[in-house]
């Protein structure tokens, strides 16, 4: 095969280097936010990483007249957490472009860039399923108060719950698969597995990994989770000795899908 690099002139190489420097220098994040929540003015908010036992601060700013802004150089595209004090408020994808954040009593929204728009759309869809799931309990209580046949009611609600859980699995699995090769895939994977007491291999995880890309499989957090889950399965089947591997190094403050689906206070 012909080595095309040898055909490049010194001028071509210089132009390429200049272009790379220009692109790198233009890569930055710019977050413009607003909030009308009481007690927010004058307080400091932070952007923090999601890796490590102690999340590291990336940026901080004060809220002035309900407005705040972060901006800086972008080393890599990643999901970070917007925090006030030690409370996580919402995830944000730190990526190139102008990111718009709104925090109010009705909604929490982040958009303006491709990955943030995608994450917000996923969160909204998940929230709709969570609300439908909550309605099942309300329907059950209402049926009991109305003196309905609870055996029939519970059968009907169990079927509805199963259908919603199937939709939830499909929504989460499809979103992760669509984002295997960016930061959203691993992030949502761990949101979905936060409810597990320990790493396990569920049918949806096994199905997901059969089509996962190498980039996703080799993500350090994904790889550590899968190794721990496989070890746990081997222990349960008697293949391995009881020796629990370390849990994946993921902070406990990451909101789960259920957390994100809760109505804002």
What are the roles of these predicted feature ranges?
Residues 21-25:
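C-terminal motif of bacterial Sec signal peptides marking the signal peptidase cleavage site
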């Amino acid at each position: 095969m012909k080595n095309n690099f040898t055909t490049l002139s010194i001028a071509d190489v210089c132009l390429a280097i200049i272009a790379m420097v220009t692109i790198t220098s233009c890569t930055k994040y710019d977050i413009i936010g607003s909030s009308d929540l009481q007690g927010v003015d004058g307080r400091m908010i932070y952007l923090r990483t999601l890796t490590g036992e102690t999340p590291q601060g990336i940026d901080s700013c004060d809220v002035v007249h309900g407005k705040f802004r972060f901006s800086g150089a972008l080393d890599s595209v990643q999901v970070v957490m917007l925090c006030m004090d030690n409370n996580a408020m919402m995830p944000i994808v730190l990526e190139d472009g102008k990111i718009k954040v709104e925090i109010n009593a009705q909604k929490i929204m982040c958009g303006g860039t491709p990955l943030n728009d995608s994450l917000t759309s996923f969160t909204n869809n998940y929230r709709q399923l969570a609300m439908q799931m909550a309605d099942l309990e309300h329907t059950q209580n209402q049926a009991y108060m109305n003196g309905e046949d609870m055996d029939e009611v519970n059968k009907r609600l169990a079927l509805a719950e199963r259908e919603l859980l199937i939709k939830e699995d499909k929504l989460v699995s499809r979103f992760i698969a669509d984002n295997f090769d960016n930061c959203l895939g691993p992030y949502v994977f761990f949101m979905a597995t936060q409810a597990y007491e320990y790493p396990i291999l569920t049918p949806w995880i096994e199905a997901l990994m059969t089509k996962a890309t190498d980039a996703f499989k080799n993500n350090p957090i994904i790889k550590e989770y899968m190794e721990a889950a496989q070890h746990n399965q081997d222990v349960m089947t008697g293949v391995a000795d009881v020796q629990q591997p370390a849990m994946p190094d993921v902070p406990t403050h990451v909101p789960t899908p259920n957390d994100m689906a809760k109505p804002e206070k």
